Amino acid sequence: MGLEEKLPSGFVLTTVEQAAGWVRKSSVFPATFGLACCAIEMMTTGAGRYDLARFGMEVFRGSPRQADLMIVAGRVSQKMAPVLRQVYDQMPNPKWVISMGVCASSGGMFNNYAIVQGVDHIVPVDIYLPGCPPRPEMLLDAILKLHQKIQTSKLGVNAEEAAREAEEAALKALPLIEMKGLLR
């Protein structure tokens, strides 16, 4: 008898999800995890020439409790891996990760025991950004792609279950160093 009976199926929920997606993508707060030369390029995107503020990212947050995007920029050592995971766990949901540069994505040229061969074995990664180091324009493009992903993401209980399953699947994947024939 009400308005919801006259609307097509899924109309109201779709509209709410689109509005919430627009709000979430327009107010992403990044936390920096700059570990090497990629961090210099990441800092450049916040300067006047590239102006990251026009995408709703005014200030890089110093506290993970105030951030929902982690940009891992540079190589991650074995000693830094637990700290990276702790910072990720302290971030509120929903949270996203950009792996910036080949060192963060695959260990880069540092194929040894001290460097983690891909940050995706510590935290689930949403966007991989190649380059050594990637240009600020590439980081802006990755952020825009993440905005598209955020805007189309689902809300509610199903979203939490999907995020949990995706994180478990990402962390169970084989490290690159153990993939036979790939690095030899």
Curated annotation (Swiss-Prot):
Give the main location.
membrane
Q: How does it sit in the membrane?
A: Peripheral membrane protein
Q: Which residues are listed for [4Fe-4S] cluster binding in this entry?
A: C37, C38, C103, C132
Supply the gene name.
Answer: nuoB1
| Alphabetized UniProt keyword annotations | 4Fe-4S, Cell membrane, Iron, Iron-sulfur, Membrane, Metal-binding, NAD, Quinone, Translocase, Transport
NCBIfam families (alphabetical): nuoB_fam, PRK06411.1
Record note on quaternary structure: NDH-1 is composed of 14 different subunits. Subunits NuoB, C, D, E, F, and G constitute the peripheral sector of the complex.
Q: Extract the GO molecular function terms from the UniProt entry.
A: 4 iron, 4 sulfur cluster binding; iron ion binding; NADH dehydrogenase (ubiquinone) activity; NADH:ubiquinone reductase (non-electrogenic) activity; quinone binding
Q: Where can this protein be found?
A: Cell membrane
Entry annotated with the keyword Transport: yes
EC id: 7.1.1.-
Q: Which SUPFAM superfamilies match?
A: HydA/Nqo6-like (SSF56770)
HAMAP family per the UniProt record, alphabetical: NDH1_NuoB
How many and how are cofactors bound here? Binds 1 [4Fe-4S] cluster.
Record's GO cellular component, any one?
Answer: plasma membrane
Name the chain's protein. NADH-quinone oxidoreductase subunit B 1
Per the UniProt record, the source organism is Streptomyces griseus subsp. griseus (strain JCM 4626 / CBS 651.72 / NBRC 13350 / KCC S-0626 / ISP 5235)
Q: Can you tell me which family this protein belongs to?
A: Belongs to the complex I 20 kDa subunit family.
Needed cofactors, names only, are: [4Fe-4S] cluster
Q: Which Gene3D superfamilies match?
A: 3.40.50.12280
Catalyses:
a quinone + NADH + 5 H(+)(in) = a quinol + NAD(+) + 4 H(+)(out)
GO BP term (any one)? aerobic respiration
InterPro entries hit by this protein: NADH_UbQ_OxRdtase-like_20kDa, NADH_UQ_OxRdtase_20Kd_su
